[in-house]
């Protein structure tokens, strides 16, 4: 469960290391974001010569959460850290060309097939 002020890791090679959620998109009073939801983030820590810099405000899709996701068979997939993939604000396609770490099967909708295909492992 990601809410405003939540810190997340960037799971791509866009140049961001750490980002902070500043808004959960998808409703006027929406409080929490889960895996597959789009959020607005600001870059808190970035590497030199990256595609994004500290202070940039971007969209991101949540790919891993500590809370996890419940499957219809009753199993729960949880992760150690919260992580997201940064998106281009206009096209909502990933900024980076590589994805680090596993992603869940719940991202396999039409919008995020690119992220699933770039990921090294799909759980």
Swiss-Prot record:
Q: Which Gene3D superfamilies match?
A: Ribosomal protein L14
The protein's UniProt keywords, in alphabetical order, are: Ribonucleoprotein, Ribosomal protein, RNA-binding, rRNA-binding
GO biological process terms, alphabetically, are: translation
Read off the SUPFAM superfamilies from this record.
Answer: Ribosomal protein L14
- Molecular function GO terms recorded: large ribosomal subunit rRNA binding; structural constituent of ribosome
Q: Which GO terms describe its cellular component?
A: cytosolic large ribosomal subunit
Subunit (UniProt): Part of the 50S ribosomal subunit. Forms a cluster with proteins L3 and L19. In the 70S ribosome, L14 and L19 interact and together make contacts with the 16S rRNA in bridges B5 and B8.
What is this protein's function? Binds to 23S rRNA. Forms part of two intersubunit bridges in the 70S ribosome.
Protein family according to the UniProt entry: Belongs to the universal ribosomal protein uL14 family.
How is this protein named in the record?
Large ribosomal subunit protein uL14
In its UniProt entry, the species of origin is given as: Vibrio campbellii (strain ATCC BAA-1116)
| Gene, per the UniProt record | rplN
């Amino acid at each position: 469960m990601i809410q405003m002020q939540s810190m997340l890791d960037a799971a791509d090679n866009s140049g961001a290391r750490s980002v902070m959620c500043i808004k959960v998109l998808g409703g006027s009073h929406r409080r929490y974001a889960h895996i597959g939801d789009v959020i607005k983030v600001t870059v808190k820590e970035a590497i030199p010569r990256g595609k994004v810099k500290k202070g940039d405000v971007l969209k991101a899709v949540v790919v891993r959460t500590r809370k996890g996701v419940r499957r219809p068979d009753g199993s729960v997939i949880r992760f150690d850290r919260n992580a997201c993939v940064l998106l281009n604000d206009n096209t909502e396609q990933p900024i980076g060309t590589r994805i680090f770490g596993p992603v869940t099967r719940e991202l396999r909708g039409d919008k995020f097939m690119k992220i699933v295909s770039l990921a090294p492992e799909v759980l």
